[in-house]
Amino acid sequence: MLLLLLVPLFLRPLGAGGAQTPNATSEGCQIIHPPWEGGIRYRGLTRDQVKAINFLPVDYEIEYVCRGEREVVGPKVRKCLANGSWTDMDTPSRCVRICSKSYLTLENGKVFLTGGDLPALDGARVEFRCDPDFHLVGSSRSVCSQGQWSTPKPHCQVNRTPHSERRAVYIGALFPMSGGWPGGQACQPAVEMALEDVNSRRDILPDYELKLIHHDSKCDPGQATKYLYELLYNDPIKIILMPGCSSVSTLVAEAARMWNLIVLSYGSSSPALSNRQRFPTFFRTHPSATLHNPTRVKLFEKWGWKKIATIQQTTEVFTSTLDDLEERVKEAGIEITFRQSFFSDPAVPVKNLKRQDARIIVGLFYETEARKVFCEVYKERLFGKKYVWFLIGWYADNWFKTYDPSINCTVEEMTEAVEGHITTEIVMLNPANTRSISNMTSQEFVEKLTKRLKRHPEETGGFQEAPLAYDAIWALALALNKTSGGGGRSGVRLEDFNYNNQTITDQIYRAMNSSSFEGVSGHVVFDASGSRMAWTLIEQLQGGSYKKIGYYDSTKDDLSWSKTDKWIGGSPPADQTLVIKTFRFLSQKLFISVSVLSSLGIVLAVVCLSFNIYNSHVRYIQNSQPNLNNLTAVGCSLALAAVFPLGLDGYHIGRSQFPFVCQARLWLLGLGFSLGYGSMFTKIWWVHTVFTKKEEKKEWRKTLEPWKLYATVGLLVGMDVLTLAIWQIVDPLHRTIETFAKEEPKEDIDVSILPQLEHCSSKKMNTWLGIFYGYKGLLLLLGIFLAYETKSVSTEKINDHRAVGMAIYNVAVLCLITAPVTMILSSQQDAAFAFASLAIVFSSYITLVVLFVPKMRRLITRGEWQSETQDTMKTGSSTNNNEEEKSRLLEKENRELEKIIAEKEERVSELRHQLQSRQQLRSRRHPPTPPDPSGGLPRGPSEPPDRLSCDGSRVHLLYK
């Protein structure tokens, strides 16, 4: 809008050099140039808009601004007047350099400014004066010239007692110069530096001098116990104890309360030392190892990891650290899925991590054990784009390249295994180049300490922890200064301290607890458990070297991220294998093929049913109980129809439709079996019941009433309907999921396939199947038995019972085989469906073909299409087809018997001829004797009968 107001103004070029005094014009005020090293802030206009105009409207205001450490001298704001001029044009505006404003204040003193006004400009003079009991250290005057004060800023220092009159306060320290952690090699010189700096200050403990009494603990609790006894029971009295490593600090801190001593450690990281009930007077400038845990949890949340695994060396420091981590991740909604530990050999735990598919792994162990772990990691291939390892950051930078005879991995293999891992390390040296309370920067401290050491820092134990030891002395000095009333405040006499004086101990404790200052290691402050709060450095091993990727301040929950993290796979991996659930569906080719067969079977059943109904007046059909055959055809149709829902799964239907499909399977198959097999079973049952009676009960054969057959079928169907109804109401079928073992995909992707299969099931499925299979199996076995028993029965009432028996054989065999096989193959959807559906199809086909095709063939080939009335009118005889068949069979049997009789007669004639020939031959050899008057000579008792004699009764035996 303002630009629209300026459009009518003429665009006119400025004069040479940009005149400061614009010409009067009714159009507004001409744009003026800013002062040197300065600029003009145009309110409401952009830079492009300012370039497009030369005049500004009346009442428009501009503001001068200066660059760098400069201030505007003269009018800072000018306003366009109605006469076309700017306000206060007679006074120029300049940007001049100012001197540091810190010289305008003095702690414990006053500053007097002359020759200028605030802020301090060129020519300004300041004079410094200290308060009573303080004296000025430095020049009392300074002049501002071209932005610089002529002298360094002085400070006010408390008037101290002369050095010879200062009272000594003793510190008992234990430095581990050797052993598991030789941190005393660098920490002792750092403590000595701090004592020199503190004792040289007049504003801290002006009446006292801190002195050190120390021993080498060798990081051994036993050795430390000896020196602790010497410190406590030998003069002079020590006002505080300073142990180093965690094992020694645990011993000292637990015993110190008995002597009312404060314990201040510079190198202990064990989380167990944070227990205030066990260690009530313990403080440490070395942060607890649990300080890594908030950083780890923050990184887990940053990368969206919800499941992690851990592996630790079995020591107290790592066990307590892991316990703390477990509590923190639980609060953050993260789960530790697998936890492993080892004492010396990590081979088995690493294998377990691999077997459990651990992806995000936190490792807590010392440097030597770290090499063993990652040698096993390489062997198990537990590294790469799928895995992230979190390690402790205080290892040496080349720890994985160090020769170690206890492992059998090369440097190249170790380098490959550790690539990409994350480390968290406590910030022990202030990364900012700011001055600490000792007036030294962190870099100046490192340079000064390096000159003091007798060997290279990388070869000196505890060099990283040296800033913590230096700041520990400063924390102690400030606490004692506050307790003693240093700086003009009232306090207690430190020289009155003894091991029974709890009052002084309590005051020192409160002073230590409220410590807050800037040290060379950063901001020093203690939490409620006496542990140092500090920043955490986050690094990642990239290309064989560690790169800083961020810092984390747990006190403020502030994560400073440099976005320099690199991942082997291009992005952070998942915390677990991504499981893709896939359903196993029935083969559509198999389903379509069986469906076609089932459809053709239904068509065949309809044809057979139609044929049977159409020819129900034919006597031959009537004698086969056509209504039962009709029920068989209907039952086969229902069973064949069950094939369709049997093959439907999630590929075709939704989850909500699945229960209906399950019920359709059950009812169609159940009713189909009851009608189809039940009608055949009824036939064979009544044939066996009626036509296998003894002779005295032949009257039963004449009284086979059809309603009894229908009642039997109805009973079987009713039992199924009742059972199915109870099943559906009490325990209905529903969709259940069967889950299989995970499968690896063919592609190289970080996913796992979880196959699943849908089933129709209920809570007590086995019970219901037991009931069904129990009585259905009995029916099948009984049907086989009855079919076998009636195979030789011939009856006019049910003329197709032999075909029924054959159908029962086939149905029973298929059912008895298929039922257990499908239960075994239930997890293989194609095989189970193929067995079940093909058994239904084949049994239905066989039943229909065996029962109906012979009838069709007989009626077609013999032309027996007449009804019983028509047949009687045509022949005039009541002989039925069954009697004709019997007559034909009897005639055939008669012919066969006549043939046998002829053969026998021919044989008899032959034997008679042979007998006569022998009699004639014998009469020639023995002439005839006179006849006995009695009619013949008597034979002796032993004389055999004559072979030529022939008894008529014997001849008749030949015809039998």
From Swiss-Prot:
Superkingdom: Eukaryota
Biased composition (Polar residues): 866-879
Residues the record marks as carrying a glycan: 23, 83, 408, 439, 481, 501, 513
Residue ranges that the Swiss-Prot or TrEMBL entry lists as coiled coil: 870-924
Gene3D superfamilies membership: 3.40.50.2300, Complement Module, domain 1
Keyword NAD: no
Signal sequence coordinates: 1-19
Domain Sushi per the UniProt entry, residue ranges: 29-95, 97-158
Family matches, as InterPro entries: ANF_lig-bd_rcpt (IPR001828), GPCR3_GABA-B (IPR002455), GPCR_3_C (IPR017978), GPCR_3_GABA_rcpt_B1 (IPR002456), Peripla_BP_I (IPR028082), Sushi/SCR/CCP_sf (IPR035976), Sushi_SCR_CCP_dom (IPR000436)
GO MF annotations, alphabetized: extracellular matrix protein binding; G protein-coupled GABA receptor activity; G protein-coupled neurotransmitter receptor activity involved in regulation of postsynaptic membrane potential; G protein-coupled neurotransmitter receptor activity involved in regulation of presynaptic membrane potential; protein heterodimerization activity
UniProt-annotated binding residues for 4-aminobutanoate: 246, 269, 286, 366, 465
Membrane-crossing residue ranges in chain numbering: 591-611, 631-651, 667-687, 710-730, 768-788, 804-824, 833-853
Tissue-specificity statement: Ubiquitously expressed in tissues including the forebrain, cerebellum, eye, atrium, ventricle, lung, stomach, small intestine, colon, liver, spleen, kidney, urinary bladder and skeletal muscle. Expressed at low levels in testis, and more highly in brain regions.
GO terms, biological process: adenylate cyclase-inhibiting G protein-coupled receptor signaling pathway; gamma-aminobutyric acid signaling pathway; negative regulation of cell population proliferation; negative regulation of dopamine secretion; negative regulation of epinephrine secretion; negative regulation of gamma-aminobutyric acid secretion; negative regulation of synaptic transmission; neuron-glial cell signaling
SUPFAM superfamilies: Complement control module/SCR domain, Periplasmic binding protein-like I
Disulfides per UniProt: 99-144, 130-156, 219-245, 375-409
Function: Component of a heterodimeric G-protein coupled receptor for GABA, formed by GABBR1 and GABBR2. Within the heterodimeric GABA receptor, only GABBR1 seems to bind agonists, while GABBR2 mediates coupling to G proteins. Ligand binding causes a conformation change that triggers signaling via guanine nucleotide-binding proteins (G proteins) and modulates the activity of down-stream effectors, such as adenylate cyclase.
UniProt record similarity statement: Belongs to the G-protein coupled receptor 3 family. GABA-B receptor subfamily.
Protein name: Gamma-aminobutyric acid type B receptor subunit 1
